[in-house]
UniProtKB/Swiss-Prot annotation:
Quaternary organization: Homodimer.
Name this protein carries in UniProt: Nitrogenase iron protein
Positions carrying ADP-ribosylarginine: R97
Gene that specifies this protein: nifH
Changes after translation: The reversible ADP-ribosylation of Arg-97 inactivates the nitrogenase reductase and regulates nitrogenase activity.
Known EC number: 1.18.6.1
Binding site for [4Fe-4S] cluster: C94, C131
UniProt organism field: Chlorobium phaeovibrioides (strain DSM 265 / 1930)
Amino-acid biosynthesis among keywords: no
């Protein structure tokens, strides 16, 4: 079972990218579980046809200790297994701790057991590595390969670099490695070349460039992944290509994060700061 975590700046399109990629892997015949690690609990909605599933933390609050695996995992597109960790009530508690509680409970209830014959588990993780809880999939070896969703926008690249610092910090302890950058295009000038260069400097690869297409939003409005909504659309082939590249990937590295000056000079070199 391959344990994958998807990180990236808030609003970059992590959940959309994760679900569309998982749909492509499921279409290939892979058995995949998605663990949403975001208090918004929107990491599995498209795989579940728009269903906002009840989160692990909400279930624990209502049911107490008497929780069964089927209470917190729902079957999604092509037999994907979907669960959402959820978060505390707004203004109370720590969302990072919620992830730790949820993943530990999933382990106790046997969600990762051999009987499920999982090929992949995907963790879709909120925003930047802002606190220890959100770093948990990296820190505790829950995830072994990380993909960072970014774009040619400055803050997305800044966040990607910060996430690399988190991977570097825990690489020895948890055995986690960076599998590559996924460029979710924002149609920034020289975007593809810039992210390829950022990846090279960090010591990794841009595993795929996902072009911007409003069809993704159309599929989302219809509560589906692109592959589910229209498997013949060209954007569906982009996610298939990304899924295939992840499936075939052999390049797993300990990243070399850039100093802020290096990052800024990269932006200047490609004309963003001009």
């Amino acid at each position: 079972m391959r344990k994958v975590a998807i990180y990236g700046k808030g609003g970059i399109g992590k959940s959309t990218t994760t679900q569309n990629t998982v749909a492509a892997l499921a279409e290939m015949g892979k058995k995949v579980m998605v663990v949403g690690c975001d208090p918004k609990a929107d990491s599995t909605r498209l795989l579940l046809g728009g269903l906002q599933q009840k989160t692990v933390l909400d279930t624990l609050r209502e049911e107490g200790e008497e929780v069964e695996l089927e209470d917190i995992i729902k079957g999604g597109y092509k037999n994907t297994r979907c669960t959402e960790s959820g978060g505390p009530e707004p203004g109370v508690g720590c969302a990072g701790r919620g992830i730790i509680t949820s993943v530990n409970l999933l382990e106790q209830l046997g969600a990762y057991d051999d009987e499920w014959e999982l090929d992949y588990v995907f963790y879709d993780v909120l925003g930047d590595v802002v606190c220890g809880g959100f770093a948990m999939p990296i820190r505790d070896g829950k995830a072994e390969e990380i993909y960072i969703v970014c774009s040619g926008e400055m803050m997305a690249m800044y966040a990607a670099n910060n996430i690399c610092k988190g991977i570097l910090k825990y690489a020895d302890a948890g055995g986690v490695r960076l599998g590559g950058l996924i460029c979710n295009s924002r149609q920034v000038e020289n975007e593809k070349a810039m992210i390829e260069e950022l990846a090279r400097k960090i010591g990794t690869q841009m595993i795929h460039f996902v072009p911007r297409d409003n069809f993704v939003q159309r599929a989302e409005i219809n509560r589906k992944t692109v592959i589910d909504y229209d498997p013949t659309h060209k954007q569906a082939d982009e996610y298939r290509a990304l899924a295939q590249k992840i499936n075939d990937n052999k390049m797993f590295v300990i990243p070399k994060p850039l100093e802020i000056e290096e990052l800024e000079s990269l932006l200047i070199e490609f004309g963003i700061a001009n």
